[in-house]
């Protein structure tokens, strides 16, 4: 079996990792061994945070809707329940935008939710 010299593939792998680690601080961007660890950890954080991003935005929307609906005299859960009973299907992202940028429209939505709850 012939001898395999791996200089070319090893260099290519090192270049790939160091390119991914470009911009990192200190040895993390210069030393292959440390850069591999930094790039791997960065990938783990990126994977985890792509999932957490969805949860965090939903939390933010709910907090904004809750604050705006309480200003109009209704808790978040009763507001959402009222919208469902009034068969108004607006998702939380849009509700949060309305709550922040168009308070008059949001107030009318709260009134419709209150009317649906009263029935």
From Swiss-Prot:
Record flagged with keyword RNA-binding: yes
InterPro entries (alphabetical): Ribosomal_bL20, RIBOSOMAL_L20_CS, Ribosomal_protein_bL20_C
Highest taxon in the source lineage: Bacteria
Gene Ontology CC: one annotated term: ribonucleoprotein complex
Keywords of this entry: Ribonucleoprotein, Ribosomal protein, RNA-binding, rRNA-binding
UniProt keyword annotation of rRNA-binding present: yes
Biological process terms in GO annotation: ribosomal large subunit assembly; translation
MF annotations from Gene Ontology: rRNA binding; structural constituent of ribosome
Disulfide cross-links: none
Pfam family, one: Ribosomal_L20
Family as reported in the entry's similarity comment: Belongs to the bacterial ribosomal protein bL20 family.
Function of the molecule: Binds directly to 23S ribosomal RNA and is necessary for the in vitro assembly process of the 50S ribosomal subunit. It is not involved in the protein synthesizing functions of that subunit.
UniProt name for this protein: Large ribosomal subunit protein bL20
Organism: Shewanella pealeana (strain ATCC 700345 / ANG-SQ1)
């Amino acid at each position: 079996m012939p001898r395999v010299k791996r200089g070319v593939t090893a260099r290519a792998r090192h270049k790939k990792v160091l390119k991914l680690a470009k911009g990192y601080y200190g040895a993390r961007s210069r030393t292959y061994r440390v850069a591999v660890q930094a790039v791997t950890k960065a990938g783990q954080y990126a994977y985890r945070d792509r999932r957490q991003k969805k949860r965090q935005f939903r939390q933010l929307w709910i907090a904004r809707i809750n604050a705006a609906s309480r200003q109009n005299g209704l808790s978040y859960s009763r507001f959402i329940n009222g919208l469902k009973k009034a068969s108004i299907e607006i998702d939380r992202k849009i509700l949060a935008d309305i709550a922040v940028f168009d308070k008059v429209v949001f107030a009318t939505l709260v009134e419709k939710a209150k009317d649906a709850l009263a029935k």
